């Protein structure tokens, strides 16, 4: 009896063992099939699909639930990537063009609002606190819109001021350059227009007290000059000569009247002057001899 009961107890166990073994084999086969199916795909794509699909929320746990709670928009795609250190990072990529993404609408101000904002900016460039709240209420705008408008207006004013300073600096530099060029040209013109010494022919007709004979002596041969110089002592005795004129320049000095006692020291006029002196002195000597 005991042996029969023991055999009965062993029977179901033996029957269960093949079933249990078959169940384990089925699980191993399912894992192998899954590996074969996923062998062609990369682990990045598997992670991406698990993060983007709702079924992957069970594996990721509370983190994926929080991401789904934040809301995954239609224009973004999230991918989980494991780097070389083993940490998993999330990358957000756009699904389509950036133009498809919804953008913030720009605030369009009316002419009245712009006029009022400009007047307030001219009065005070920084509007804060109650003033900004009251201005936003009067213009039917939000405080953020008023704040952003004032920020943009201050930035524009700074740009305009810097541009004006650059223009003034460039204009002043140009004026200084032009002035230096004009001064340089004037200096060059003054140096080039230095008056030259007047020539002898230009000064000879304008000098008073010069006769044609004197001009002939200055320009003629020495013989004529010796004959023309003879009447000088008699003329000086009868009427006094006018005082000599000051020399205009060094080139006009030979044209002045020479006094009677002046003796020419040049070798060309010496023989003629000696002959004339002997002729003039001979009548006086004869008179002295007669008196004796």
Swiss-Prot record:
CDD domains: homeodomain
Record-linked Pfam families: Homeodomain
Cellular-component GO terms for this entry: cytoplasm; nucleus
A single GO BP: embryonic eye morphogenesis
InterPro entries: EMX-VAX-Noto_Homeobox_TFs, HD, HD_metazoa, Homeobox_CS, Homeodomain-like_sf, HTH_motif
Highest taxon listed in the record's lineage: Eukaryota
DNA-binding region: 102-161
Compositionally biased tracts (Polar residues): 38-55
Protein name: Ventral anterior homeobox 2
Keywords: Developmental protein, DNA-binding, Homeobox, Nucleus, Transcription, Transcription regulation, Wnt signaling pathway
Subcellular location: Nucleus
MF terms (GO), sorted A to Z: chromatin DNA binding; DNA-binding transcription factor activity, RNA polymerase II-specific; DNA-binding transcription repressor activity, RNA polymerase II-specific; RNA polymerase II cis-regulatory region sequence-specific DNA binding; RNA polymerase II intronic transcription regulatory region sequence-specific DNA binding; sequence-specific double-stranded DNA binding
Role according to the record: Transcription factor that may function in dorsoventral specification of the forebrain. Regulates the expression of Wnt signaling antagonists including the expression of a truncated TCF7L2 isoform that cannot bind CTNNB1 and acts therefore as a potent dominant-negative Wnt antagonist. Plays a crucial role in eye development and, in particular, in the specification of the ventral optic vesicle. May be a regulator of axial polarization in the retina.
Stretches with biased composition (Basic and acidic residues): 1-36
Region: Disordered, residue numbers: 1-74, 212-241
Family classification: Belongs to the EMX homeobox family.
